[in-house]
Amino acid sequence: MLSGTDFVKKIKEGNKELFEASRSNVRRFFASKPSDEYLVEHFRGRMVNEAQNMYAIAGQVASADPSTDVKDLELLSRQAMDEAKHFRMVKEVIEHITGEELDVAAAFAAEAEKPQAKGASLLDKYEASDDEAALAAYQLVAEGRAEAVWNEMATCVEDKFISSRYATIAKDEGFHSNLGGRALSKLVEGSEALQSHVLALVEKMRVDLLEISNQNTATPLAVV
C-alpha cells in the first residue's frame, strides 16, 4: 500500500498519456482552421461545461457535513468561484467572436438540443456528489487534463483576446487539479481498499475522457 502522497504521484504519472493525446487532438482541431460559426459552437459547449462544473462544486460546498475541514471548504469554494469566472470568460469569448451580446438561456437550450460530450458529465456517472474520493479523483484527473488542454488551446489560438483567457483558465484548472490531489492524498492514507477503489475509477475516467476528446475533435464542432 502506498502513502497518500505516493498514491497521488502514481496517478499523475499515469495521466501523462491521456494529457498528451488530448493536446494532440487540440492541435489537430485548430490546424483545421475552423470557421467562426464552428468556434461559436465550440465555445458554447465549453461555456455550458464550465457552468456544470460550477453547479456541481457549489453543490458540494452547500451540502458539506459540518465536520468538514474549514480549509477544505475554503478551497472548494474558491474552485466554485473559479468555475463561475470561467463561465463568464467563455461567454465573453463568444460575444467577442459574434460582436453581439449572448442570450445565455438560448445558448443553454441550443446545447441541450445538440449536446457535445463534456467532462463534467462524469461527475454524475461516477456519483461524485455522494463519493468524496470520486470527486477528488475527478478533480485530479479531469481538471489536470483541462489544464493541459486549455494551455494547448492558448498556444494554438491566434486571437490574443481568446488566447489570454485560455491561459488564465488553464492556470486555474491546474490549481483545481492540485486541490483534488490534496484531498485524495488525505482520503486514501492508510486505506488499501479505498486506494483500489480509486484506481479502478481513475482507469475508467481516463478511458471516458479520451473518448470525449476523440469524439469532439473528430468534427469541427469540438469541445476538447
Kindly give the residue locations of the regions a language model identified.
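Non-heme di-metal
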Residues: M1-V224
